[in-house]
Amino acid sequence: MAQYDVAIIGAGSAGALIAARLSEDPARNVLLIEAGGRPSDPDILKPSMWPAIQHRSYDWDYKTTPQEGAAGRSFAWARGKGLGGSSLLHAMGYMRGHPADFAAWAEATGDERWSWEGLLPSFMANEDHVSGGDGIHGKDGPMPVWIPDDEVSPLTQAFMTAGNALGLPRIPDHNTGQMIGVTPNSLMIRDGRRVTVAEAWLTPEVCARPNLTIMTGTLTRRLKLEKSHVSAIELAGPEGLATVTASEIILSAGSLESPALLMRSGIGRENVLREAGVTCRVKAPELGLNLMDHLLGAGNLYATKKHLPPSRLQHSESMAYMRAGDFSAGGQPEIVVGCGVAPIVSESFTAPAPGNAYSFLFGVTHPTSRGEIRITGDAPDSPLIIDPRYLQTQNDRNLFRAALGAAREIGHRPELAEWRDHEILPKSLAASQDIDTFIAKAVITHHHPSGTCRMGKDEMSVVDADLRLRGLDNLYVVDGSVLPSLTAGPIHAAVQAIAENFTTGFK
């Protein structure tokens, strides 16, 4: 039986970073386990191929339950399967979040390490930012952060000018602590190519370290528990079943697979485990609960007066964050409007041909609806029940109305007259019920599932402020599942900062 000092389960946005950082110590024997392979599809590297690369062999391609708040639709949840995890598939946006987001984390955990100030060194350590070295952005880190300029579509330029005319300030980027305003999206792109976390952290030099073992195509079946200790990890790989041991185990399989593996191992809510035929060995009353995600309305659709050239980036080029009902207000964002240089609509509607229309996406930055994930059996291939319970709170419905209103106000501005012929969707909506019906049909996932193993200072939380799983002495969870609440924008930058912050304190 192979033995390691540290075993990391999952080579995605957190796991790849953790493996690279912890293996910097040549005396530490590190194992990185990944269920997927080493994807070589050249389309991954092409920013303009997002989101067309979803549903391929390196996508877990989950499905949610039908959502009452979204016109009864089920949603496809793209989750990366392979070295790099969901950085293989995401929209490449790099947005840290607002300082108030992290103040909520510090309050939830009772630990200032999770505040904006506490996480800033971790953000900067990860970044190779075009503005790096200015005291707020990192320089020479593994992950490039690029702000487009001439590459931005003229439609996006007009969108930003329209937002500015309404009172939104022009900001340098989304990552200075001020998110409200207009700016091109910061992107994890170098020389016109997507950069995954595998490329950034698992470089040939890192992979050649004698103290780092990387297993691909290897599924973690379950964790073997002895009292308050994980004694072994049961694997299924290319050569069949195997068991390994490690002094410390770090679970970084993501917001769906991390709680699923814990449940299959006998950790979780007693009733859920009992229904799945699993004996409960460690009670975790909130494991799998607190499931959060961002939604975007797709969309506020306009026909063009003239041909719209395709985006040279990733279609959604600028996200304008703002308060609801006041374009000139500052503080923590409540809603967002994004410029889509393509006719982006949900499957409820028929999209016009590319080049003939464009969409303004709209969403809520801090939704209060919460869902859950459950296992249905003890086998890794047993289906997961994923129920995000979208749009179940009045707060979310009210703010989505405000977000749609903001999108339409920007969309009808004179600054966009060069491009706008007429509005296709939603046309006239009189009553609140009509607006809610349209939104329910229009929303799509922003692909930010999180929160299912939330960190906190209370005993009900799944992990503590050190990210150690309550009830076990050698198991940590480090990925998007530990978020106690959502950041205002895409969560990828925050997940990387969580992983970096964790490694600095890991002994």
UniProtKB/Swiss-Prot annotation:
Q: Name one GO molecular function term.
A: pyridoxine 4-oxidase activity
The catalytic residues are 448
Gene Ontology process terms (BP): vitamin B6 catabolic process
Q: In which pathway does it act?
A: Cofactor degradation; B6 vitamer degradation; pyridoxal from pyridoxine (oxidase route): step 1/1
pH dependence, per the record?
A: Optimum pH is 7.5-8.0.
Question: Source organism's superkingdom?
Answer: Bacteria
In terms of InterPro entries, this protein maps to: FAD/NAD-bd_sf, GMC_OxRdtase, GMC_OxRdtase_N, GMC_OxRtase_C
Q: Which PROSITE patterns match?
A: GMC_OXRED_1 (PS00623), GMC_OXRED_2 (PS00624)
Q: Which reaction does it catalyse?
A: pyridoxine + O2 = pyridoxal + H2O2
Entry's EC annotation: 1.1.3.12
**Keywords for this entry?**
FAD, Flavoprotein, Oxidoreductase
Q: How does activity depend on temperature?
A: Optimum temperature is 40 degrees Celsius.
What are its cofactors?
FAD
- Oligomer and partners: Monomer.
> Do you know which PANTHER family this protein is assigned to?
CHOLINE DEHYDROGENASE, MITOCHONDRIAL, GLUCOSE-METHANOL-CHOLINE GMC OXIDOREDUCTASE
Family, per the entry? Belongs to the GMC oxidoreductase family.
Write the protein's name: Pyridoxine 4-oxidase
| Species | Microbacterium luteolum
